Amino acid sequence: MAPSLRNFNFFHRFSTFLVFSLFSVVSSDDLQVLLKLKSSFADSNLAVFDSWKLNSGIGPCSFIGVTCNSRGNVTEIDLSRRGLSGNFPFDSVCEIQSLEKLSLGFNSLSGIIPSDLKNCTSLKYLDLGNNLFSGAFPEFSSLNQLQFLYLNNSAFSGVFPWKSLRNATSLVVLSLGDNPFDATADFPVEVVSLKKLSWLYLSNCSIAGKIPPAIGDLTELRNLEISDSGLTGEIPSEISKLTNLWQLELYNNSLTGKLPTGFGNLKNLTYLDASTNLLQGDLSELRSLTNLVSLQMFENEFSGEIPLEFGEFKDLVNLSLYTNKLTGSLPQGLGSLADFDFIDASENLLTGPIPPDMCKNGKMKALLLLQNNLTGSIPESYANCLTLQRFRVSENNLNGTVPAGLWGLPKLEIIDIEMNNFEGPITADIKNGKMLGALYLGFNKLSDELPEEIGDTESLTKVELNNNRFTGKIPSSIGKLKGLSSLKMQSNGFSGEIPDSIGSCSMLSDVNMAQNSISGEIPHTLGSLPTLNALNLSDNKLSGRIPESLSSLRLSLLDLSNNRLSGRIPLSLSSYNGSFNGNPGLCSTTIKSFNRCINPSRSHGDTRVFVLCIVFGLLILLASLVFFLYLKKTEKKEGRSLKHESWSIKSFRKMSFTEDDIIDSIKEENLIGRGGCGDVYRVVLGDGKEVAVKHIRCSSTQKNFSSAMPILTEREGRSKEFETEVQTLSSIRHLNVVKLYCSITSDDSSLLVYEYLPNGSLWDMLHSCKKSNLGWETRYDIALGAAKGLEYLHHGYERPVIHRDVKSSNILLDEFLKPRIADFGLAKILQASNGGPESTHVVAGTYGYIAPAEYGYASKVTEKCDVYSFGVVLMELVTGKKPIEAEFGESKDIVNWVSNNLKSKESVMEIVDKKIGEMYREDAVKMLRIAIICTARLPGLRPTMRSVVQMIEDAEPCRLMGIVISKESDVKVKEIS
């Protein structure tokens, strides 16, 4: 072989060896870093790391979530949506010098981001969004190759390092929204110097000041979101240069002035939302935005007419203009060319008829035109709108009859036509309205009898028929409405008797049948309604005695005046002064304005009756004893059959008991409460430990069972409440959420076993006979703990868990008065955002804890429903009042009452619970401010629970221990900043 050829072969082999060695070194370094990363999450047992093994043969490039370049260097780590929690080892990961992409979004990572992040100098893509980090985001000037930066919704706080953006001139996406950063005095100038930006998301991150004219220099922008901020001043005319924009979000700021001239140049705009500002002028600049799909301009001060061109937009499906000063008619062509989905033009000065074609293409879900001056009748076309879910046209000047088919639309959830001039009947078509949750028909001229078919609308929760011309009997089928909470029938011409079946409406809280011609006796079944809060049967022709069963109710309002009642006023009801006037046949031993009841023992004839009653009573007692012995025998047989039944137990935590220990203790004497979806029992185990057992009731087959029947009775399958509660609680691990130990099921019964909380509920502590004198520090700790529990539900998962029935009776207290969120029978896990979260046909919850306008403007149940309910709980803690009190007035709740007492500092102090010490009253007012923010009328204005927790932490009272240290600490922080 020639020397030159030998030299070439040697050089070739040496080069190959050298390259292979270098490859091995780089891959080995990267491998060690990745294995260290894996070890950081060793306790999590996550499937994503199963492939991250030392002996995988190919090296780190084969790991799931890892990408390498052609030289074998790790360039990308994508662990988004992988269930990661805890601290992430940024210090070691940033040793990978070739790393260009780090994607960790949609996890539960926590802790403070270390300054080591600046060592990831090759990063082009960084996604830390939707996590649970804390503290400030570190300075990142060295990351000068960044093109994509996602930090949104990750709980960062403090001062954001805006100056670091000066080196990030290649940024295409900047997403910092939904973080409680320290407020800026002005709009950050560093942002408007990023000329390559196509996506800018700065919503809800404490940006303040005016929108700078230089925003017009970002001509590549396609998405601009700066909503939920402190922006002021006018929208600069330079914004018209952003001709590539397809989405512009400016809502919930304090912007003023008119839409700038040239705004119509943004012809690519598809989504525009400038709602909840102080904008004025007309909407004429929008007439040329023909590509609009969604236009949201509600809650401003716009005036003038709605452009006729809106009726010609072919893609417009969502139009929200409510709470402005718009005049003229709605464009009659609205929806005729588009797949119209939603319109809300409520609370304006609109006139003319309702456009007939908004459901022409059969896609419309909501028609909301309440509080205007509309005239004419409801177009017949809407009786065929099978997709319609909400129909609200109250407080207008509409007339005519309601199209028959409208009553029975299959997806309709709410009909609100009150305060108009409608005539005619409710037709039998209503039987087809299986999703119908609310009927608001008050103050019209509707007439005829209520159809018996109204009982077939299984989902009805609110029926308001007041101030109409209805006649005839109240249909007995009303007892089939198991979810009915409010029944208002006052000021009509109803006659006949109140049906006994009303006692089957176990969720009723408000009944008003005043000013009718109802006769007969008051049904004793009304006394079996556990949640009844207000009962008004005044101005009728009722006769007979007042049922003793009413004594068991805890009513804030009772009015039986102006009837034909007779007999004794039950002693326990005598405190309802004025509730019995106009009934000359009534007598009382305690109310002076009534005749004194005659003592039966004074009459010889009555004495005979008295003796007969005793004899008769003894006979009943004897018969009861025989029946009791028979039941005992039956229960033993039942117990023996349960023993041999096939049970399945599914545990979620370490347990020291068996299913037999639980089943043997489900007895009447262990019953401690009835929840929204089941009965609760206290069970003492053999080792002395106590647990709570909930026996879930089937919603679909729920019946009224007597206490004499077997407790674990046959069921038709598993209830949806049981499945919901198990699904929700089995995976939850949080200090402030009640612990679920296991579920126990058979073909016939469903049981859930929880930790037992000995101090009952917050409601008990504040309002019941068990109420305790809670100090402010304890109330504060309860508020903070409950808020953290809800925050975990809303933000601790990839998809939020919505409780849907937050109230003080569902906040349980342990032996140290630490709170736990409980009763998840109504909970809902929001579905993936593809197509939006599922809507629900009825806003679940409890009267007094639900926003009055939730039906009006909330198209779906969201986390903001829980936020409102929690705000009501905070008001209970501060004021000591129940959500509904007689002193608030007719149709008023605690939110109205608090709002009406905000006129001065003195009036605010007056509503703070007198049991709260003087030194803490200012702290209580701080909490009241948070409650007011939480109970904002519009869901969009309510904070997230994450923000609520932060606000409550900021409102921590100065405690007597360590007060000097705390003050010094505060001073030091201020000096450092």
From Swiss-Prot:
SUPFAM superfamilies the record matches: L domain-like, Protein kinase-like (PK-like), RNI-like
Pfam families reported in the protein's UniProt record: LRR_1, LRR_14, LRR_8, LRRNT_2, Pkinase
Position of the signal peptide: 1-28
Binding, ATP: 672-680, 694
EC number(s) on file: 2.7.11.1
Keyword Nucleotide-binding: yes
Annotated membrane topology: Single-pass membrane protein
Superkingdom classification of source: Eukaryota
LRR repeats, residue ranges: 71-95, 96-119, 121-145, 168-194, 195-218, 219-242, 244-265, 267-289, 290-312, 313-337, 339-361, 362-385, 386-409, 411-433, 434-457, 458-481, 482-505, 507-529, 530-553, 555-578
Residues exposed to the Extracellular side: 29-608
InterPro entries from the UniProt entry: Kinase-like_dom_sf, Leu-rich_rpt, LRR_dom_sf, LRR_N_plant-typ, LRR_R13L4/SHOC2-like, Plant_LRR-RLKs, Prot_kinase_dom, Ser/Thr_kinase_AS
Keywords: ATP-binding, Glycoprotein, Kinase, Leucine-rich repeat, Membrane, Nucleotide-binding, Plant defense, Receptor, Repeat, Serine/threonine-protein kinase, Signal, Stress response, Transferase, Transmembrane, Transmembrane helix
Chief site of localization: membrane
Family statement drawn from the similarity comment of this UniProt entry: Belongs to the protein kinase superfamily. Ser/Thr protein kinase family.
Subunit and interaction comment: Interacts with PIP1.
Protein name: Receptor-like protein kinase 7
Organism: Arabidopsis thaliana (Mouse-ear cress)
Organism placement in taxonomy: Eukaryota, Viridiplantae, Streptophyta, Embryophyta, Tracheophyta
